[in-house]
Amino acid sequence: MQIIDTHQHLWDLDLFRYAWLDSLPELNRSFRMPDYLAAAEGLNVVKSVHLEADVDEIYMLDETRHLLVLADEPDNPLEGIVACGRPESKDFNSYLDKIVGHPRLKGIRRVLHTQPDEVGRGTTFIKNVAALFSYGLSFDICVLARQLPIAIKLVSKCPDVIFILDHCGVPQVKERILDPWRSYITELAKFTNVSCKISGLVAYADPKRWSAEDLRPFIEHAIASFGWDRVLFGSDWPVCTLSASYRQWVEALQAITQGAGEVNQRKLFHDNAVRVYRLS
């Protein structure tokens, strides 16, 4: 089965700084395209979408331009770039004007789980996210489970924007806490302009003793809520390596979904990504 990875990261510490890596020594080194290709080897990953990795703000524009150049190179699967952005800023539109126009630029992400809740609730933030529609860009939502009501409000105010919820809304997998995450997901899934990325969950599991069964209730509820036409596979590499290899995560998700049949698995691992991220 061909795979489109809708959530890969790269970071080059010789070029840019990512302050959050200081607290994660396992990840605090450069991860470049050759490393990604080695991790995905043999898994038939035919395309990928790069998600910004919360680069320090002074490097946002340079990182985006660097990734767009990389996406144009012929020897890698990069088909789309989701760039870093600050919708809470009054200068957001001028920032967008500097990066739009490249066909591989697909969307914007602002990591909210590291920010005060007021950031995602702000009037300027919501107005600027709503404006992404006019740029032809989507928005990746990256929040903790407790912040999902913020995501629900945001989506309700931006009916024309394509939204992708990253990491199933970051449930507490290790602690096996399903509620209130479960009801929030059910509510968010009512908005048909939102898709859910089945990604990141293995990184939130117990790194020493996780199994596919630990992930299953979260994955099955997300899929049941959004349906097979609005779920996407993402590796979250290299963050997934905190608990599992790229291959281990893929095989766990394939095992969890094998009873759904080949057509639905193909939607999850490939077809939906083409539509949601507007890939070739």
Describe each PLM feature range.
Residues 58-77, 164-165, 215-224, 247-256:
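Short, electropositive alpha-helical surface patch
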